[in-house]
Amino acid sequence: MDEALNENASGSESDASSVASNLHDDEIIPWFFSREEIERNSPSRRDGIDLKTETRLRDSYCTFLEILGERLKVPQVTIATAIFFCHRFFLRQSHAKNDRQTIATVCMLLAGKVEETPVTLEDVIIASYERIHKKDLAGAQRKEVYDQQKELVLIGEELVLSTLNFDLCISHPYKPLVEAIKKYMVEDAKTQLAQFAWNFVNDCLRTTLCLQYQPHHIAAGAILLAAELPTVDLQSYREVLCQEFDITPCQLEDIRGQILELYERIPTSQESKVESSGGVAVVHQPISRDMASTEKCPSSDIEGGSSQVNLSQSDDHSVHDGSRSEGIGEVNSESEAQKNLQDHSVGNIMVEKSDDVGVVQLKKDLQLHQEEVESKQEKDKKSFEKDITKIDLMDEKDLTESEVEDEINKTMQTGRQIFMKVEDPDDNMTVEHSEIRNANNSGVDDELVADTCLINDSDL
């Protein structure tokens, strides 16, 4: 990783022996806690790292693992397992004492072994080093550099195994999700609902839900959230979900709410633009996390691509990269969270008339919206810089806030194209906006994370 890792090496060795001495081979470590317990008792909190900073660090290593997994060409289930290992590790170890990128590299190596998709130590080290040191891509080919990284990874592997007490058994929500959809959902709803539910499961890997709930509970929450799509009428299945997954309505709602929080915490990073054509307002706006949460319409599209779920498979290894195609999700502008959308989206601005007057009014409203977004981004930036000065674990080679947001925007499974409908209150006319496209198409270093899933018609 970087020079700071050399200082961590000796500390990691002592940490590993310390953890090992406090654990026994027959000791069973509980891996499920309440959200309050996780946030209050985090080891990072004792080292002065607040919840907001820890959340940023969690997003950082999740993004790192997704990109690393794509470079190594491992399936989604292996990436998910690596993220699980990282979450469990930092449940018991502090971010201040352990380099997250080294730990993430170790977790990817272990996940490949556990999921029987092994990758060589050399490949993992080189891919990880090139990801971290973008300006020194040839460095990993030098023997002295490679040997140093190898030593760090092997030390980290001992520490991770000791911290997890060699408990590497991981279950994912994918299998119960697919089985429930095949069992209960009507044919017309299978494809769309399964796609969105699968994407929600992938996205919630960035949360601590896997440390709070059983995999089948998370699957139930993802299905419930996907069932709120305007084109799917499955709310009557709420009781069925509770019975099938042995979950209470309160737990189901809590999972749904935490998934939505994931989309709400990251603001829009691009400004919106408005054009007019023939009296129709055309809005080009990147999809924000708030839009994803309130409109409930995320997808796995990256650069216009979509991912596929193979319903013909029922085990955790049924995940595969799907062919890329244009994916469009229709949004209901009267969703139950429409009020919150007004602070972050211009898509719901009512056009008084479908002529020049309406376009002018829309531009004025958009001007105010842009000023609010810019002001909020400036405050977030200052807050972030303040957090960085409080702790020294975010060094100059780590991702800045804007880079983290760019990476998350690429990897989050949110919808990239949406048709939005605006009703005219006077003439009862409907104006269909053109496609809303994500302005951040280029990405960083042309790195894209392969999506999993989408359903083939032949699988239904």
From Swiss-Prot:
SUPFAM superfamilies per UniProt: Cyclin-like
UniProt GO MF annotations? cyclin-dependent protein serine/threonine kinase regulator activity
Biased composition (Polar residues) is annotated at 332-345
Query: Sorted alphabetically, which InterPro entries does this protein's record hold?
Result: Cyclin-like_dom, Cyclin-like_sf, Cyclin/Ssn8, Cyclin_C-dom, Cyclin_N
**What's an example Gene Ontology biological process for this entry?**
cell division
Q: What's the domain of life for this entry?
A: Eukaryota
This protein's UniProt keywords: Cell cycle, Cell division, Cyclin
- State the residue spans of region: Disordered: 1-20, 285-345
Listed Basic and acidic residues bias regions: 314-324
* CDD domains named among the record's database cross-references: CYCLIN_AcCycT_rpt1, CYCLIN_AcCycT_rpt2
Q: Which Pfam families match?
A: Cyclin_C, Cyclin_N
User: Can you tell me which family this protein belongs to?
Assistant: Belongs to the cyclin family. Cyclin T subfamily.
What name is this protein filed under? Cyclin-T1-2
State the organism named in the record.
Answer: Arabidopsis thaliana
